[in-house]
Amino acid sequence: MEKIIKNGKLVTDSEIFDADILIRDEKIVAVGKEFNESNAEIIDASGKLVLPGGVDAHVHLDLPMPGTVSSDDHYTGTKAAAFGGTTTVIDFANHDLPSLIDSFNVWQEKALPNVAIDYGIHQNFTRFNENTLKE
């Protein structure tokens, strides 16, 4: 199924211009005018700005803390982000296990089935040793 966002003002990092957006299989495939509308769902963006999705490069989702866990889990936090126009988050993952890679994999297995938007992970080095150096 195709969608066309029509009549909006597209905002980029350098300009604002009139254009339509053609979406196929949930991906933007073209920006321009005069797309074939015969089989497309039309979204009228007249009088509206059309912006790219935001990226939040530092979030804490389902993060254990002494005696509690952060308020949003991976689903509620990414769903709330989407409602605010954020389409990608980079989540903090604890380095709780002896291996950085194991900590990363455990966090990813916990998160990925539950996220509602694009998702990445960053970690800190809470300890540095020979194993960490090898990884």
Pin down the residues of each PLM region.
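Metal-associated gating/positioning segment near the N- to mid-region
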Residues: 45-114
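Glycine-rich, flexible loop/turn motifs
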Residues: 38-39, 70, 115, 121
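Short strand->helix junction
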Residues: 11, 17, 67, 96-97, ...
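Histidine-rich, glycine-flanked metal-binding segment
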Residues: 1-4, 9-52
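Metal-coordinating catalytic core of metallo-dependent amide/deamination hydrolases
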Residues: 108-135
